[in-house]
């Protein structure tokens, strides 16, 4: 089902309600959650209603909740697999040369990208640790009907831990730069010549950082954060998710962090 934050055809939510009967009572219990919060998802149990439960009732309900969780995880894995096959098949047919107004506006080149059948559309591959394509990020020539200049495709893709590599294979001891968006990654590589890892958004920096630590042991990791100084949380309070997520990822995987510095009413990305 659709969950908070879903756009387009995305449906990352799930729920299950079931009935349990003992000799004299009927209980209703269940769970709900969203896969948007990662591969393990967010899983919330609903408090059973219908009266006081025995220890046996609680064990039965616990077993059913765990079974429901495993069932949903299997469904999600199947959706990821279908999306990956679909994306990989389309990727093979896309041309390596083309034009993108998005890239021109950002003043970056196409590094490992391909171009869509719709004029002006560029696509960034999303790969997992095994280098399998799990999906793509579409960079539109102009914002779409929802006002978005970027969108993930196809529905059901596994975004957590997915990345795009730019530049040479890093030798032991060399620096690896990790960032959010493609334009930022391309700008960093064009400026430094270093290996850059695009994680697509701030929330994916930690999963991608863990994957890169496994792939590239002995390298220096530098998390290049967006400076989201204009952002506020749901309460309207200042919140800088770009810096927060980058610092947390660096501390967890063992790395350093940095963000762009501007004067006055500043910009917020390395591309700027």
Place the predicted regions along the sequence by residue.
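Non-catalytic accessory segments of DNA primases and related replication-initiation nucleases
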Residues: 1-102, 228-230, 235
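Short linear loop/turn motifs
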Residues: 2, 113-124, 265
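Acidic surface patches and DE-rich sequence motifs
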Residues: 22, 38, 116-117, 128, ...
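Phosphate-handling DNA/RNA-contact segment within nucleic-acid enzymes
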Residues: 79, 120-219
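Serine endopeptidase catalytic core focused on the charge-relay Asp
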Residues: 95, 100-108, 128-130
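Phosphate-handling catalytic cores of nucleic-acid transaction enzymes
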Residues: 110-115, 134, 222
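TOPRIM fold recognition
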Residues: 171-174, 186-272
């Amino acid at each position: 089902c659709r969950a908070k934050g879903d756009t387009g055809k995305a449906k990352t939510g799930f729920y299950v309600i079931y009935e349990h009967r003992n000799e004299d009572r009927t209980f209703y219990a269940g769970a709900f959650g969203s896969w948007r919060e990662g591969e393990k998802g967010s899983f919330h149990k609903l408090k059973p209603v219908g009266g006081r439960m025995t220890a046996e009732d609680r064990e039965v309900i616990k077993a059913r909740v765990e079974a429901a969780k495993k069932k949903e995880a299997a469904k999600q894995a199947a959706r990821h697999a279908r999306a990956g096959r679909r994306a990989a098949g389309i990727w093979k047919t896309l041309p390596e040369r083309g034009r993108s107004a998005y890239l021109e506006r950002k003043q970056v080149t196409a590094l490992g990208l391909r171009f869509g059948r719709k004029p002006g559309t560029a696509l960034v591959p999303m790969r997992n640790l095994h280098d399998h394509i799990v999906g793509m990020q579409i960079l539109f020539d102009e914002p779409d009907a929802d006002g978005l200049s970027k969108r993930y495709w196809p529905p059901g893709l596994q975004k957590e831990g997915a990345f795009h590599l730019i530049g040479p294979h890093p030798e032991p001891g060399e620096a690896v730069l990790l960032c959010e968006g493609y334009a930022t990654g391309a700008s960093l590589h064009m400026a430094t010549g270093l290996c850059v890892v695009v994680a697509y958004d701030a929330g994916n920096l930690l999963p991608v950082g863990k994957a890169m630590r496994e792939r590239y042991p002995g390298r220096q990791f530098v998390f290049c954060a967006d400076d989201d100084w204009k952002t506020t949380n749901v309460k309207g309070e200042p919140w800088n998710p770009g810096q927060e997520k980058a610092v947390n990822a660096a501390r967890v995987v063992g790395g350093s962090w940095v963000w762009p510095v501007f004067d006055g009413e500043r910009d917020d990305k390395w591309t700027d």
